[in-house]
Amino acid sequence: MTLAASKSISRAKGGNIYGWSGSYGLTSSAVTLLSYTNPSAFYLTRITLGIDWSSISVGEVLSYIIDVDGQALFVEKFVVDADNTGDQPKMFEFIIPPNSTVKIQASESANNGSISCMLTGYRL
């Protein structure tokens, strides 16, 4: 199976779901990486964000959000400093109920850097 960049997800044999956003340039307004409606089953979902730090500087603000049915499931916003520049976010793992709408977004205060998102969902 080939996984092409898309804001949606793909299903594979066995009912599991996969998604890859491709790479997006970060801007000061939220960039949508993935936006989809979960299939009609429960899924243990894992999301990994990859940040290209090459043009992000100390003092800039980076944020990302995982939204499920209009509610913020996870939000992280921080000022880039010498201690965290280059760090990749931890993997997020949660269970998504059937037919829920999921949206993953990110922003960066100075319009620098880029980000991508990979998703794997295991049908429970």
Language-model features, listed with the residues they occupy:
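Beta-strand-centric surfaces of beta-sandwich/beta-rich domains
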Residues: 1-124
